[in-house]
Amino acid sequence: MQLDKNRISPGSKNWISFFFHLHQQGELNIGFKFKSHSLEDCLHYIFNQTGLLYGYPVSNLYSPEKYVSHLTSEEKLKLLLFENLFFTYNYYHSNEDDVYESFITSLASFYEHYGSKISLWNLTFDQNKNIKIEKIINERVKLKSKIGDGRYWLNQSSNGLVFVDVLLYSTFLKEDHFDAKALHENIVFNVLFHMTKSAQIDGVIEEKEMRLLMYLLQSSNLDEGIKQQLEAYIRNTLDENIEIKYPSNLLHRKFIFELCVYLNYGTHQVKPDEERKLREIGKHLNLNPSEVEEASLFSRTFILKNRSNLSIINQDKSLSVFYKNIQSKWTRILGRNKEKIVSELKESKEFMDLLSKSTVKDLSNDEKELMKKQFYDILKTMPSLAIFLLPGGALLLPMISKLFPEMLPTSFQENTIDDFEDPEK
């Protein structure tokens, strides 16, 4: 076991054993509980909430801050990848007696299959399985080929596409036989092809966009011939008419589109014509208008939450424009879920008791806060809504008071969505 008993240290040996020890002791717990039986819904939320989709870890899945505050960005990404793999296994096998041993055995089997097909590493293993997985995770996160001084758009020097491992592992757990190489190639090629297409919608690939695309290309683990084809396309020296097979999995297509949105909205202020062309990319990915809108909002919410680390969104004027631009879209998402939200609220006896009381007398400040918390907690159980929540519910509660006036006392409606303030101020 690692030497420091107060920290999880993916840079040290035996950190996986320590992770299991803490989990068994109840020190590590999943930070949410969804009323959803769909792994796809959960992964959609988790990848965006934690930053795994963007190769930029902003939070962990199981590990409290006290165990991980000391970690480098690369170490956080190692832990986050492992946590996501563990979560995926638990989704299918949560009732097993020795879940840790069976998970590691399963994961080792997966990486033996995956790694041999895609030539991810050239390692020999004579250690126990935990140490073997530690070495594999280290290899997966490490970026083998660096560009320039290694400082990319977000100062990243780790593999930006490790989320693909989780998607492939999920398939591995569901299907006895699947072509890991073909699925890996299909997802990664589509990511790079469509992100390049999105970078070109304003007529030019800007420097920050080019650096991000080349960084992801180096993370791709694609065959050299395919990488050369994509690099030529990125550098605009190859005809756009490339034969491409779109992913059949809806979640995979959503992730691809969200990365396209991330590239555009994270690098500059998107104009209406660019937004229209972005929606066309979503349409080409066989997403319907509602799916395009929701996927776009997932990505843009991640940018808003983490804007201090992104260039354009860190400017006050741009932030205000960015926020105003997506308010109405958030409201539509909430509106489409109105019946479901009302149904969940009616199941909460405490909420309904307070609501009933509010019709005959004013609630105390404590009761108002409790009612807000009830509303907030219910939204957190819905993956398609939980992603939009900032700490304290700063963005959603004013909108909710307009959508559900019959479910909230008038005292909750003193703030309007036009009275925007930066939630972090």
Predicted region positions:
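Hydrophobic alpha-helical transmembrane segments
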Residues: 386-388
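Small-residue-enriched hydrophobic alpha-helices in membranes
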Residues: 1-376, 380-384, 393, 401-406, ...
